[in-house]
Curated annotation (Swiss-Prot):
Active site, per annotation: Y269, H280, K311
Catalytic activity: pretRNA = a 3'-half-tRNA molecule with a 5'-OH end + a 5'-half-tRNA molecule with a 2',3'-cyclic phosphate end + an intron with a 2',3'-cyclic phosphate and a 5'-hydroxyl terminus
Keywords per UniProt: Lyase, tRNA processing
Family of the protein in this entry: Belongs to the tRNA-intron endonuclease family. Archaeal long subfamily.
Protein name: tRNA-splicing endonuclease
Lineage: Archaea, Methanobacteriati, Methanobacteriota, Stenosarchaea group, Halobacteria
Cysteines paired by S-S bonds: none
CDD domains: tRNA-intron_lyase_C
Species the sequence originates in: Haloarcula marismortui (strain ATCC 43049 / DSM 3752 / JCM 8966 / VKM B-1809) (Halobacterium marismortui)
Any single Pfam family the record assigns to this protein: tRNA_int_endo_N
Function: Endonuclease that removes tRNA introns. Cleaves pre-tRNA at the 5'- and 3'-splice sites to release the intron. The products are an intron and two tRNA half-molecules bearing 2',3' cyclic phosphate and 5'-OH termini. Recognizes a pseudosymmetric substrate in which 2 bulged loops of 3 bases are separated by a stem of 4 bp.
Length: 335
């Protein structure tokens, strides 16, 4: 069987179409023949289904500039798991943007109109642009060519934690605001702050206090500007991003609390009825600028930690002014 490499495709004839496309979903039909992407041809060489391409065996072809060993590791892994898949090329799949492979449900192929996963591939020493995530599976290939799959999804964050709070007064002390005589609803129903003791006083974080003052539910000397200024003194621009995300979470009916012990900005509760009958938090939220680039190792660590404590990792991507927030959930996936 004669196969030749022409540019970025491997040309194969009608016999190859019958053997590889019709029965196993390799390649793209072209005038009765098929074109193979180099990674597909490399897999056929690896399996021994073809002997050579332009005189190159599997070892020679994989070592050439025609095919990426990182792409091959993912392609082979997904084929080993029983999936048919197509390289995401213009004219080969309906929507090629934002993916490297389009993976079909088991038992389906490129002739069906079903897609299981859109896969984007990176090596462990590459970086992933935060805004590129969502609506795809990130396949990370480590130095031993093992593949970790991370499902990324853009979603809305919402809940029913919207208890009303009567206005109260507080005192700005260092990096906290203390409400000495707060209404019971502040902590018990709306889950703001932490109680200092049995006397009923509640201490608020700066981000909680800034939100409450801006919403007119808390008064402090100097007003909201004093709290925000203090927040910027201790956190810089990060405080404004965290405040924007905190505000958006509260507006969506979600009660955020510090996520420090989990290495996150917030942990969130979607359905708070009272502080005494509190369920488990559902999300860990990290606040990041929209132009953030993830190191795969850090991303895998965040997701692994969230999974270990039965939560979902969500990244809140903020613009400079915090006017727009995109929520990207990332979870481990076993295809």
């Amino acid at each position: 069987m004669e196969l030749t490499l022409e540019g970025d495709v491997v040309r194969a004839g009608y016999e190859a179409r019958e053997r590889f496309y019709d029965s196993r979903g390799y390649g793209k039909v072209r005038n009765g023949d098929i074109d193979l992407a180099p990674v597909e041809a490399a897999h056929l060489l690896y399996r021994g289904d073809i002997e050579s391409i332009d005189g190159m065996d599997f070892r020679g072809f994989l070592g050439s500039a025609a095919v990426s060993e990182v792409d091959f590791a993912v392609y082979k892994d997904l084929r080993d798991r029983g999936f048919y898949l197509t390289p995401a090329r213009e004219g080969w799949v309906d929507d090629a943007a934002g993916a490297d492979f389009v993976v079909y449900p088991r038992g389906k192929g490129p002739w069906d109109n079903e897609v299981a996963y859109r896969v984007r591939i990176i090596g462990e020493r590459d970086t992933a642009v935060a805004t590129d995530l969502g609506g795809c599976v990130l396949a990370v290939v480590d130095e031993e060519s093992e593949v970790t799959y991370l499902d990324t999804d853009r979603r809305e964050v919402s809940g029913t934690s919207d208890a009303a709070v009567p206005a109260t007064a507080g005192e700005l002390l260092g990096e906290r605001v203390v409400c000495w005589e707060p209404p019971a609803e502040l902590y018990e129903q709306a889950f703001y702050g932490q109680q200092l003791g049995d006397d009923g006083a509640v201490q608020l974080s700066l981000v909680e206090a800034a939100y409450l003052t801006q919403e007119g539910m808390l008064t402090v000397e100097g007003g909201a500007d004093a709290v925000v200024e203090r927040g910027r003194e201790v956190e810089g621009d990060r405080f404004d991003r965290r405040l924007a995300v905190y505000t958006a979470l509260r507006a969506s009916g979600v009660a955020p609390k510090t996520g420090f012990k989990f290495g996150a900005d917030f942990r969130t509760y979607a359905d708070v009825e009272s502080a005494e009958n509190l369920g488990h938090s559902e999300l860990l939220v990290r606040v990041l600028p929209a132009d953030h680039r993830f190191e795969p190792r850090d991303l895998a660590l965040d997701v692994r930690l969230a999974h270990g404590v039965r939560k979902t990792m969500v990244f809140a991507l903020t613009t400079d002014g915090g006017d727009e927030i995109e929520w990207v959930a990332v979870e481990r996936l076993t295809p």
